[in-house]
Amino acid sequence: MGAGASAEEKHSRELEKKLKEDAEKDARTVKLLLLGAGESGKSTIVKQMKIIHQDGYSLEECLEFIAIIYGNTLQSILAIVRAMTTLNIQYGDSARQDDARKLMHMADTIEEGTMPKEMSDIIQRLWKDSGIQACFERASEYQLNDSAGYYLSDLERLVTPGYVPTEQDVLRSRVKTTGIIETQFSFKDLNFRMFDVGGQRSERKKWIHCFEGVTCIIFIAALSAYDMVLVEDDEVNRMHESLHLFNSICNHRYFATTSIVLFLNKKDVFSEKIKKAHLSICFPDYDGPNTYEDAGNYIKVQFLELNMRRDVKEIYSHMTCATDTQNVKFVFDAVTDIIIKENLKDCGLF
């Protein structure tokens, strides 16, 4: 009997040890949910985590982005060409009209994600046209990728034989997120599980089952969206949609005890745009100076004031540029410190 009892005790001790290890692992596991409207920069933050906290992109992985980059570049110039008609803008050189027609035809016939020389030559000629540049300046009046100017002004490099996308090229590439993408990494003794959820309206119903046991929500809102409308509804201002979404998340009963961090993203695009387009486009009551600091702060306050439990729940906010690795590294470091502090508070150690 003694031998049986000691075997049981041993088994019990092993089980206890395993449960303790599992509990410790759970305590060190951080479930991060990235939420925000479409095209706010969520997937770019995920790419940065791969660069900062994993091993970055291998040569093979970088090469896989070529087709996406060429696709993004072509879609961008086509969007500008179409907008030339809708906005009734004339080409600086009438010969570009033929180029535009040729491009439209080629776009339908080439293999997706390729960039034949004839096509890249046409795109480069179009991009230099004064009419196209005037149309590009009015990008908030139609749907255009943020990366349009970045790729189009550097197309010569992108079509050089043997081209390998740089980290920045990869960060700027855009693929609509459908479904949920999980990324795992370790940092400061914590195991992170980060979930990127599609932001377009049709994708949001998939969020609900991610809510269980979330440690922290990073809500991403594009500062530069204040003069833009939704891809899926051209009657709705993107900033208003983002505020509406933030309101429903920060006051949701599911998240009463969840840390929430607000990333006011695309500060680089915003700082350029605010020089030309007044914030009152989005907030008619705003009559402050139309500067990066004042307008940016006003937007931040609009978000933070939606928090109905301000007395007991603090929402931390950061101005971010998701394509700037150093900025994201710095901000994510601060977010991790908040998570550690909140965790210690929950354990009664803080």
Swiss-Prot record:
Residues 340-350 are annotated as: Interaction with RHO. Residues 261-268 are annotated as: G4 motif. It is a peripheral membrane protein. Keywords: Cell projection, GTP-binding, Lipoprotein, Magnesium, Membrane, Metal-binding, Myristate, Nucleotide-binding, Phosphoprotein, Sensory transduction, Transducer, Vision. CDD domains: G-alpha. Disulfide bonds: none annotated. This is Guanine nucleotide-binding protein G(t) subunit alpha-1. A lipid is attached at residue 2 (N-myristoyl glycine). GO terms for biological process: adenylate cyclase-modulating G protein-coupled receptor signaling pathway; background adaptation; cell population proliferation; cellular response to electrical stimulus; detection of light stimulus involved in visual perception; dopamine secretion; eye photoreceptor cell development; neural tissue regeneration. It comes from Canis lupus familiaris. One of its GO terms (cellular component) is membrane. Belongs to the G-alpha family. G(i/o/t/z) subfamily. Functions as a signal transducer for the rod photoreceptor RHO. Required for normal RHO-mediated light perception by the retina. Guanine nucleotide-binding proteins (G proteins) function as transducers downstream of G protein-coupled receptors (GPCRs), such as the photoreceptor RHO. The alpha chain contains the guanine nucleotide binding site and alternates between an active, GTP-bound state and an inactive, GDP-bound state. Activated RHO promotes GDP release and GTP binding. Signaling is mediated via downstream effector proteins, such as cGMP-phosphodiesterase.
